[in-house]
Structures are given as structure tokens and as C-alpha cells.
Amino acid sequence: MSGILGCFSTKIGMNQFERALQTMAHRGPEGCGVEVLPQVPFGKTVFIGHRRFAIVASSDAAHQPMRVDNWIITYDGEILNYKELRQGLEAKGFSFFSDSDTEVVLKSFIAYGPECMRAFRGMWAFAIWDESAKQLFLARDRFGIKPLFYFSNGEDFAFSSEIKALLLLDFVPKAPAIDGIKSFLLWGPPEYKSDTMFSGIKKLMPSHYLLFELESDGSLSDIKITKYYSIRDKIQPKNTGITFPEAVEQYRHHHRKAVEYNLVTDVPMGCALSGGLDSSSNVAVLKSLLEERSATNMREKLVTFSAVYLNQPDRSCDESVFINRLSNYLGVTNKQVEPTSDCYIANVEKFLWHQEEPTGGASVFAGWCVAECISRNGICVCLDGQGADEYLGGYHSFIGAFLVQNSFLFWKNWPFLFAGNNSLSLKKAIMYYSSHSFSKISKRRFFRELTEQFGLNSSVLEE
């Protein structure tokens, strides 16, 4: 994790920019770099900053912002296949002065332009300033693992890893986005929109890049935002002709390969362990890979981290039994935290300062507690199990989506099930539809339309 910041403006100086960059010191405690590029004919100044947290190539040669000829990059991320990409660039005649993936990203862009990201495996948020063309390129990884925000008023422009840094720049308004707040209260976090809770500040969405340039009169050109990747293009149903056991074996192979790619690090590494299938699989594969690399004393080499709920009135979400069982079976160390209500009250200001926007549930705070525990234990890189529920259908809400697609017999027989105002069938249907599928307002609207369409007694809903 690192922090990136940049702006194009006539309104701020070096002191203000450095103060804004300092708000992200936690993202890069190992160093700080700033590049100042006065655009003399235009009266604007380009500031490009970086807070460094190195997990690959920690030498000074990898210092950022990094310049190669007319191109300057500030980069937060990790390209897992950077060594292979470097070999390809060397074959094209490129030479390298560092062992960093930062240099590989920059020279890949010089060689291929935005198309370079098609070959990247990993996570990234970066900005490249082309001093010759007076052009800025911003990009974010396919799934939005790395954060990237920006602000533009047509005259000034800024980008950052975190909102708080933008708010310290004079030309960025310090005001709430009322429509964004209303939308959050009605529908939950705007995960699939570029809006934030702050006026004028946008997210660069996952799988997108942004491009603009300084015009001859010093004004900013229109911002062009392009989507460079769509997962739909990769998952269209195909008749592969393979059996279910063959599909399982392919999945196992790809999962193991993904974990292996994430071992590209020069610092201590841990693994999150929730007790579920996804994180448990990660821990088992990670331990196996480390053993293959002849790592000694595995109990010391691999540490796992978990959130547990041992002292809660409702222990239905506590998975400590599975966590302890797997830790003992694999012989790995496990560190546990318990995110209680008292813990939340004691840490709410710090949590919100880091989170910056409202969250959709308490699980985000639990994740924050685990991350803090990881940091306290000196672990710099931690493998997590995020994403498995999305592509393996692990959420209750997917039941509703399945029904809406008209692919389930239950949905086709909907009117028949409620014939004669059968309250028992209705209750079963409501349970089947899943109480986790929609927000309260969405469910209320759905059931209101249901009663009107089929002439049902609304008192059934009150039960």
C-alpha cells in the first residue's frame, strides 16, 4: 500500500501540497517524494506526490515519483507478473535501472499505451504525466482493489488515493454531496457509481482509465473516461465439454496459481482466516507453497488473523470453532481480535477517519480491526479471501437475483402459489426470497406490488 497525490492548479503552493500528502503518511511511512513541474506559459503548476510503502524492491532506485525521459509516474499497487513483463520489455530493447514493478508499469505504458494493462496481473492505481504532450493518464485496476479519487472544476484538477488529502486543497469544496447521502440512506453504499459523499469528488471506477491534457491556453481539455475491461467478456456461458470433476480440478489449479502469484514480496506475509471455505483454502494452499519452497519452522513463518465473537449475546456469526480447528490441523499461528461494541465506541473516530465514507454494515469495522491487528504484529502483506462469495454465489442476496432471471420453477409458478390468498404459502415465499436480498425500502415496495397484483390481504405482510 502506498499513497499517490497530484494536482494541476494556479491556486496552491508547495506547503499546501505537502500538507495534503502528509495526511496519507500511514499509507507510506517509508518515504515521501514530490515532483514540481511549473507550466510556465500557462501559469499552472503540476504537483505529483507519493508516499512509499515498499513490499517489492525497497532500494532507493525505486523511489517515486519516478521519471523516465518525459514521463513521470506515481503508483500504488503490485503487479504480480512484473518479472515476466520486464523480460518482454527487455526483448524490445528497454533497459532497467531498478528491480521495481513501478518501472515495469511506466515502461509498459511507454511501449504500449493504455493497452499495457491487458497484460497486468495484480492491483494498481497510478498516474502518468507526459511532460511532452502535457497529458495526464490515470488508471485503476480491474476490480477496484486500489482506491483512486479525483476532483475537477474545469480549471483545476486533483487526484488522490484518499479523499482527506483532496479536502486540504483550496480549490476543492468542503461540502457534503446531498444527493449522494440521500442515495446512501435509501439504497446503501454507491459501490457501482462514481459519486462519493463529498461534493465534486468522484471515484475513478474499477476497470477505467482517465485522460486529459493541458490546452494551448492553459485550460483543461474535456476529461475522457474509458472502460478498458469487462468481466462479462470473460464469463459468457460456453459448452466446454468438460466434466464436473475436471472443472473442479481446473478451479483448484487456478486458485493455487493465484495464491502463488501473491507470494511475490520481500517482506513478512500473513493470511486472513475467517473460518469459511475461501480463506481456509487460501491458508492451506499458502502453507503448502511455503513448504515447497523449503521454508523452515512453519509455525513461525505463517501467521493467520481472525475476527471472533466469543462474548456476544448472539454468537451465530462466530466461527472460532472452525478457525481453531483449521489452525491446529495446519499447525499455523492464529491471532484473534473481537470487534465488540465497546471496541467500536473507542475506535469510531479513527475508523471513520480511515474509512472516509459510510459503510454498508458492521463487517467493515471487523475487517478494520483485523487489519490493525495485522499491522501491530509487524506483518506488511496479508492474503485475504475477498471475492469468492461473489463469483461462487455465496450470498443470500443471489437467491433473489436467481428468481428475477426467470430461471427458477418457483418464479414461474408464482400466481399459483398464492391462489386463494394462502397466507402459509406467502410466508414460505417470503422466506425463500431471502430477508437478506434487498434493503428494507426495496422489500417494502416489492411486497406492496405483490399484494396489489394478486389481491392479497396486506395484514399477512404485517405478520
Where are these regions (language model features)?
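Cysteine-centered catalytic environments shared across enzyme families
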Residues: 1-349, 353-354, 367
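Glycine-rich active-site loop/lid subdomains used to bind and stabilize high-energy intermediates
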Residues: 155, 213, 310, 324-463
